[in-house]
Design a protein with these regions (language model features):
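Conserved catalytic network of the ASCE P-loop NTPase/AAA+ motor domain
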Residues: 13, 29, 60-64
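Inter-lobe connector of SF1/SF2 helicase motors
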Residues: 114, 136-171
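Short beta-strand segments
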Residues: 1-3, 20-23, 105, 159-161
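Conserved P-loop NTPase motor "coupling/switch" region that bridges the ATPase
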Residues: 35, 53-146
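Conserved two-lobed SF2 helicase motor
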Residues: 13-28
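Walker B catalytic acidic pair
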Residues: 39-40
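Catalytic P-loop NTPase motifs of RecA-like helicase/translocase cores
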Residues: 26, 43-48, 77-78
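Conserved Walker A/P-loop ATP-binding site and its immediately adjacent core
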Residues: 1-9, 77-82
Length: 171
């Protein structure tokens, strides 16, 4: 994907400079940026603590104070709760009034506990609709058809019986 973006940039020959990197190279980035575009932003949606990637992005944004565009085909792959760390680096994000994810979760997540061996752990996967409601003004959504995809996807669901032990872990 990087080489494709760079090839398009060369063809367009714009009067601005771009740097295209992957998330794994964030630590190498130097310079000042007016705009940062982050593709696959859902990859920063760790729970309940921010991922290393999200922390690096936050550091870059804090240093540069750029405009930020987050892109993702699947912004909430598991839960609306994942939105928090995707946007927490942006100073004007709709959740910036919360000190951290836990404060955010008290308002926007139905937190429940799950037994893990002899311990109970908090589970933050039941994000409320309020998260999407707060994010709506910042999001642009397209269907595959609106985005120009012509491929028809035919899905087939395969059901597989797991070992009883696996079901015990899940429950």
């Amino acid at each position: 994907a990087i080489s494709s973006i760079e090839a398009d940039y060369k063809k367009l020959n714009p009067n601005y400079e771009i740097i295209v990197i992957n998330y794994e190279s964030l630590h190498k980035v130097q310079g000042r940026f007016d705009l940062i575009v982050l593709d696959e932003a859902h990859s920063m949606g760790a729970l309940p603590k921010p991922s290393k990637r999200a922390k690096q992005v936050k550091e870059l944004i804090t240093l540069n104070q750029p405009y930020v565009i987050l892109m993702s085909g699947t912004p909430t792959p598991e839960s609306f709760s994942q939105m928090y760390h995707q946007v927490y680096a942006c100073p004007k994000n709709p959740f910036s009034s919360f000190k951290n994810f836990y404060a955010f979760a008290r308002v926007h997540v139905n937190v429940y506990q799950k037994k893990l061996g002899v311990h109970s752990v908090n589970v933050y996967l039941d994000g409320k609709q309020s998260i999407i409601d707060e994010m709506k003004p910042y999001m642009i959504s397209y269907t595959q058809k609106e985005a120009g995809f012509k491929a028809q996807t035919n899905e087939h669901v395969l059901k597989v019986r797991l070992k009883d032990r696996t079901y015990e872990i899940i429950d």
